[in-house]
A protein has these predicted regions:
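Ferredoxin-like iron-sulfur electron-transfer modules
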Residues: 33-53, 84-103, 135-151, 185-186, ...
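Iron-sulfur cluster-binding cysteine motifs and their immediate structural context
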Residues: 21, 45-71, 98-125, 166, ...
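Glycine-rich dinucleotide-binding loop and its adjacent helix/turn
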Residues: 123-142, 203-220, 243-316, 323, ...
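A conserved FAD-binding loop/helix module that cradles the flavin
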Residues: 291, 445-475
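Feature captures the FAD/FMN-dependent oxidoreductase FAD-binding
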Residues: 142, 147-149, 199-248, 366-379, ...
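Beta1-alpha1 glycine-rich phosphate/pyrophosphate-binding loop at the start
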Residues: 26-27, 49-51, 58-75, 113, ...
Length: 645
């Protein structure tokens, strides 16, 4: 028989524990033996795995909940602007990342255990594109009088400049090239990143008051010593612009063997309009996919001469060559099988549709060089992988004909002029706060720390900006949390909606549930814990198909000269519908299950004038019998039976 509410009031405190009760009983499955439990529900915010998997550290659950209408803005702010503000707290490039990020967040999505992941990228693109269409802008913080030099105008540099201006610090960006954007402009083709959208997201940052000095190389046009005199701190966001060559015989010194970055930059800056007749690219990541996809689009024209000529100088092809181009052959080789390649699955599928030949499980052995000193082919063989080491399969050797061989197997830094900052890998060493090791006042972010994703560079820039702020304000560097992301803050939300708790009056109390100076029975563990799918009530969720973006992927007969954007955005209705597929892991999404199924009517909705995101329900502990049905039926894993432990 369950303990009566009157006996519970008499025998227990509000926390529902007994003196000497230190054993954590496993009550899972014992919901009909409720009188055994002295535990009552507590509300726990945890990080969803999408956010835990996001290198930029975005509050993904937060802006999905805004788009779907669960979390609402105050005043007359639109849903679109509110979602934009939440997304750009971490990432000032939602339109770009919604298009080209390989989306590790989607791989980590708990919805994969129900039907299919939430199309996070597609909703992010909707947020970013809508912000551009509506002219949403950023506000700079109140001036601190501090100045920061940002070396590099790519994703890391511009993201850092954005965060620094929000903090009130002056930021000057030094960029070696003629335009800002880094890899987003010079490494990724325009049919994946529309240049007008890129310009809009860059200009929005510049309009915060960021000073820009293009065509300026630090170490050549301005010295490090001068930077240290003129600025209070320096952030190095150089990127990695030196492509790695193939470590096989015949590569070094062969003119028509080039790296993928050289190839893509020549195309993206408008110099290269046609290429070779037979292109072979070695890689398996997104860069290699871009190389072969570009080659298929621009094609071949014999009148252009040797394909490497335009890559090894600063000349520009005449447009007439492109107008008379014919299709070329493009082959991509990868050590890994297709299911293990680093490129996004849809990029591999699209490239195949466009007529690219993909040879997976193949390793390069030798560049075949002709009598004229140019490569005529690439000798390869089948292989298997032992970890990251290829193991050749004997008897499978063959030669792939080629008049241009492109290596897209990684990249390194160009530290000429700033060699004092280089490590033995020609990168820059950083500590956990992205300070340059043994260089006070110098910080670093992006590929020059470790070549990785655009979203990784953006995430590092955010952490580096926080560290710079601490340095400039003479504050102790904060210890980075285990789950180092941008998190929803209930305390900030309460302030936003006018429900800020009262100041603590230091008077005795029967319990915090009776007072308004505390957020009672809530614990934010988002900086320490990621919630797994097995903590959710998955039976709550119906199977719902993803809302897919329309793609303009040409086939092999249509690809020549096809430069239309590949990925169309979702309309508002589809974006909202896709956001509604989010399971809001680790945060209440106001389903009412706990209220409906509580047999004691102990769980109740908070009054509307006191309710907000994360404070939708509460518990009357004088009625709770510890049956933990509320926790069992909570779809999002927001309820733990923790009170009384």
């Amino acid at each position: 028989m369950a303990t009566s509410s009157e006996e519970m009031k008499k025998d227990h405190t509000f926390r529902r524990y007994e003196d000497g009760d230190y054993i954590n009983d496993d009550m899972h499955g014992n919901i009909f033996q409720a009188s055994w439990s002295h535990k009552c529900p507590t509300y726990i915010q945890r990080t969803p795995p999408c956010q835990g998997s996001c290198p930029a550290g975005e509050d993904i659950r937060g802006w999905l909940d805004i788009v779907r209408g669960i979390e609402k803005p105050t005043g007359d702010m639109s849903m679109q602007e509110y979602a934009f503000r939440r997304a750009t707290d971490a990432n000032p490039f939602p339109s770009m990342m919604g298009r080209v990020c390989p989306a590790p967040c989607e791989e980590g999505c708990n919805r994969n255990h129900v039907d299919d992941f939430v199309g996070i990228n597609s909703v992010e693109q909707y947020i970013g594109d809508t912000a551009i269409e509506n002219g949403f802008s950023y506000e700079a913080g109140a001036s601190t009088g501090k100045k920061v030099a940002v070396i590099g105008g790519g994703p890391a540099g511009m993201a850092a400049a954005y965060q620094l201006r929000r903090m009130g610090h002056a930021a000057t960006v030094f960029e070696e090239r003629a335009e800002l954007g880094g890899m987003m402009r010079y490494g990724i083709p325009g049919y994946r990143i529309p240049r007008e959208k890129l310009a809009a997201e860059i200009n929005r940052i510049v309009d915060m008051g960021v000073e820009v000095k293009t065509n300026t190389r630090v170490g050549k046009d301005i010295s490090t010593d001068q930077l240290e005199k003129d600025f209070d701190a320096v952030l190095w966001a150089l990127g990695c612009w030196t492509g790695r060559g193939l470590p096989v015989d015949g590569w070094d010194g062969t003119s028509n063997c080039v790296d993928g970055l050289t190839f893509l930059e020549a195309f993206n800056n408008g110099r290269m309009k046609v290429t070779g007749q037979k292109i072979v690219c070695i890689g398996g990541g997104d860069t290699s996919i871009d190389v072969v996809s570009v080659a298929r689009r621009i094609g071949y024209n014999a009148e252009a001469g040797l394909p490497e000529a335009i890559l090894n100088n600063n000349e520009t092809h005449d447009q007439s060559l492109a107008d008379a181009a014919v299709p070329c052959d493009a082959t991509l080789t990868s050590l890994f099988t297709k299911d293990k390649m680093f490129a996004a699955e849809h990029e591999i599928t699209d490239a195949t549709e466009e007529g690219v030949t993909i040879l997976d499980g193949v390793m390069p052995l030798e560049v075949i060089v002709g009598d004229d000193g140019r490569a005529t082919g690439l000798k390869v063989c089948d292989c298997t992988m032992d970890g990251m080491t290829p193991v050749p399969t004997e008897g499978t050797e063959r030669v792939i004909e080629a008049d241009l061989i492109v290596a897209a197997i990684g990249q390194g830094g160009d530290m000429e002029g700033v060699e004092d900052f280089a490590n033995d890998r020609n990168l820059i060493n950083a500590d956990k706060n992205y300070q340059v090791v043994d260089k006070p006042g110098h910080f670093v972010a992006g590929d020059i720390v470790r070549p990785h994703l655009l979203t990784t560079a953006i995430g590092q820039a955010s952490v580096a900006a926080e560290s710079i702020n601490s340095y400039l304000m003479a504050e102790k560097m904060a210890r980075r949390p285990k789950v180092d992301k941008h998190h929803f803050s209930l305390s900030e939300k309460l302030v936003e909606v006018g429900l800020e708790p009262d100041p603590y009056d230091k008077q005795s109390s029967t319990g915090t549930s009776e007072e308004n100076y505390a957020v009672h029975n809530f614990d934010d563990r988002s900086e320490h814990e990621i919630i797994n799918y097995d903590a959710l009530f998955l039976g709550h969720f119906e199977q719902v198909d993803r809302n897919l973006r329309a793609e303009d992927v040409p086939n092999s007969d249509q690809v020549l000269g096809h430069f239309h954007e590949r990925m169309a955005g979702l309309a508002e209705e589809a974006a909202v519908a896709e956001a509604e597929r989010c399971m809001s892991c680790g945060m209440c999404f106001e389903c009412d299950n706990c209220v409906i199924f509580c047999p004691q009517d102990a769980v109740y909705r908070v009054k509307k004038d006191q309710s907000t995101t994360g404070r939708y329900v509460a518990t009357d502990y004088s009625k709770c019998i510890g049956c933990h049905i509320c926790a069992e039926v909570c779809p999002t894993g927001y309820i733990d039976m923790g009170m009384g432990e």
